[in-house]
Amino acid sequence: VDEWAAAGRKNIFGETVLVQEMQSEGGAAGAVHGSLQAGALTTTYTASQGLLLMIPNMYKIAGEFLPCVFHVSARTLASHALCIFGDHQDVMSARQTGFAMLAEGSVQEVMDLAGVAHLSTIKSRVPFMNFFDGFRTSHEIQKIEMLENEDLAPLIDQEALAEFRARALNPMNPVARDRKS
């Protein structure tokens, strides 16, 4: 995504993607939440330790029915043994947040189900956690069949997208929000 943004590649909406690297994963999750409140479709990429720091904001995002996708490279959590192999204890610790979960087992599945996650979150207003093995799959070099924007664009629920953007915070139409909004 960094390379695509630097090259000025357009996303499915014809816009150049903005990549923002934060100092910590907790800050990244807060930035995702704020960006979603402002009406921007937002996603983040993280690994195990980072996901644990994002859990408080994940509750807020799910509770406010904000459509987003967290892509997670699942690995063993750091301990005295410092194991880098994959397991799902990080993802399982976030299962109670209200995020729907998709798991992949190959590089092609990561590509395919990432699109499914983004399309599904827009339609359902349920945030998604899209995760895969953070050692084997994330290091695998494999040819994949890319999903093209032209193929995905007709699948976007335009009405749900318009409703999401209409709910965005706007200084011209101020509102006070709490957990019931």
Put a short name on every predicted segment.
Residues 13, 128-180:
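Conformationally flexible catalytic loops at phosphate/diphosphate-handling active centers
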Residues 37, 111, 118-120, 167, ...:
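Broad hydrophobic/π-residue packing in well-ordered secondary structure
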Residues 42, 64-73, 94, 116-124, ...:
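Short secondary-structure transition/capping segments
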Residues 84-134, 146, 158-161:
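Conserved thiamine diphosphate
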